């Protein structure tokens, strides 16, 4: 029995110590630092708004795309159901998926004859991208204006208000947050 304890005691103590350090202490420290340094992002970047009854309602996250399909809304990138897309860009399956999405856009807005921006017919790498390009937002302005009975100028102003610039002024492209635009559109008095 003594030999058994000599062998297993260090293993059990090591297991418990590593579990405590790696499972409690380290995540706790990282959570505290993240909460202090990035207060809004550490808790999911949840968007909250005051409701008519005075309570606060949660509408979603600034960092996770939501599906909008009604014509009066700005519609984001094609969702891939929360999973990354692994399709080869030149595969037949990808081609059929893009053609299906193009047909959906033409059915949604048959009067729009412009070329559909690529990000509206392809899914992002994460499958839950909350932003679209300025071109993708501009493609939808006339439809949103018509469906909501508001001027295109108003729609463009709302889109511009929720467009983020390039990172550090030169990295990447400006993007438009779909959820923020739709919340702003819904807040308009009609």
UniProtKB/Swiss-Prot annotation:
One of its GO terms (cellular component) is plasma membrane. It is a single-pass membrane protein. The keyword Nucleotide-binding applies. The chain crosses the membrane at residues 13-33. InterPro entries: KdpC. Keywords: ATP-binding, Cell membrane, Ion transport, Membrane, Nucleotide-binding, Potassium, Potassium transport, Transmembrane, Transmembrane helix, Transport. Disulfide bonds: none annotated. It comes from the Bacteria. It is found in: Cell membrane. One of its GO terms (molecular function) is ATP binding. The keyword Signal does not apply. HAMAP family: KdpC (MF_00276). Belongs to the KdpC family. Part of the high-affinity ATP-driven potassium transport (or Kdp) system, which catalyzes the hydrolysis of ATP coupled with the electrogenic transport of potassium into the cytoplasm. This subunit acts as a catalytic chaperone that increases the ATP-binding affinity of the ATP-hydrolyzing subunit KdpB by the formation of a transient KdpB/KdpC/ATP ternary complex. The system is composed of three essential subunits: KdpA, KdpB and KdpC. This is Potassium-transporting ATPase KdpC subunit. It comes from Listeria welshimeri serovar 6b (strain ATCC 35897 / DSM 20650 / CCUG 15529 / CIP 8149 / NCTC 11857 / SLCC 5334 / V8). The gene is kdpC.
């Amino acid at each position: 029995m003594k030999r058994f304890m000599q062998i297993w005691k260090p293993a059990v103590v090591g297991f418990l110590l590593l579990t405590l350090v790696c499972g409690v202490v380290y995540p706790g420290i990282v959570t505290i630092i993240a909460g202090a340094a990035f207060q809004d992002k550490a808790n999911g970047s949840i968007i909250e708004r005051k409701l008519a009854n005075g309570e606060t309602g949660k509408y979603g996250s600034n960092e996770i795309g939501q599906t909008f399909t009604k014509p009066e809304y700005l519609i984001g990138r094609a969702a891939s159901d929360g999973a990354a897309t692994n399709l080869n860009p030149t595969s037949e399956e990808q081609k059929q998926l893009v053609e299906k999405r193009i047909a959906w856009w033409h059915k949604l807005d048959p009067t729009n004859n412009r070329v559909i921006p690529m990000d509206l017919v392809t899914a992002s790498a994460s499958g839950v991208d909350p932003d679209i390009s300025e071109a993708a937002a501009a493609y939808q302005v006339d439809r949103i204006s018509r469906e909501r009975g508001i001027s295109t100028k108003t729609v463009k102003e709302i889109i511009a208000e929720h467009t983020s610039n390039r990172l550090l002024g030169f990295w990447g492209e400006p993007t438009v947050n779909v959820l923020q635009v739709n919340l702003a559109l819904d807040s308009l008095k009609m």
